[in-house]
Amino acid sequence: MTSDRVTRAELLRWSETLAGIARTGLGFSQVQFERERYEEILHVASDMRVAAGHDLVREELHGEWMRSVGSGVPGYVTPKVAVGAVVGNDDGELLLLQRADSGHWLYPTGWADIGYSAAEVAVKEVREETGIECEPVSVLSIVDGLRHGFTTVPLYSIVFFCRATGGSLQAHPLEATDVGWFREDNLPTPLIGLERWVPQAFAAVQGALHPTEFDPPRDPVWRG
């Protein structure tokens, strides 16, 4: 670290990492001594998570993590996967929706579903949330949500660039309050992560595809 002061993002990352190690250990070990140590690590992680601003109190968070412990391979804790779709049309416009939960605008996105490929999830999310049919063209980005600070849940975000192929605008009644096509000079507000993804998105819409964005390894890769 470059400062003696620990940031909330660092505390959150360390907490989630410790919790993942401890829950994975509990999922694989039946040795009582080891299990007790893993549970103690979970207590430390819950203290850190609460200090980072979690809504639950220490005991509730620890209990929630304990209830999520699986056995064997299903118990190996990994980041969740979110799949998004930046969709462009022939008029150079970008498909955006206003999220029902926050009122913010963003491209269609959702959790990866079992039984679907990542590209299929992108097509499915676009259809369900906006009524538009699309075809995936390329992967724009694969990034760590915690590292970029746009989530408090450990996740990898995979964002596809897609071209609209049909359908008509229709907002999902539970997930979106509005949907629409927008040019770069007429974007709605508030828009999530404007500077982070919008320039790359419109470059793709206009045909200037770039290499997939990803988080370069830190040096050292871990831990601080």
Regions found by a protein language model. Give the residues of each.
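N-terminal strand-loop-strand
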Residues: W65-Y107, C134, S138
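Unchanged
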Residues: A112-P136, V143-A201, V221-G224
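Juxtamembrane/interface motifs at transmembrane-helix termini
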Residues: D55-E60, Y116, L209-H210
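Short glycine-rich loop/turn motifs that provide flexible caps or phosphate-binding loops at active sites
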Residues: Q30, V81-V83, P108-T109, I114
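Alpha-helix C-capping/helix-to-loop hinge sites
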Residues: T24-F28, G72, V143-L146
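Nudix hydrolase/Nudix homology domain
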Residues: T2-Y38, V44, H104, L174-G224
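Acidic, metal-coordinating catalytic segment for phosphate/diphosphate chemistry
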Residues: R35, E39-G84
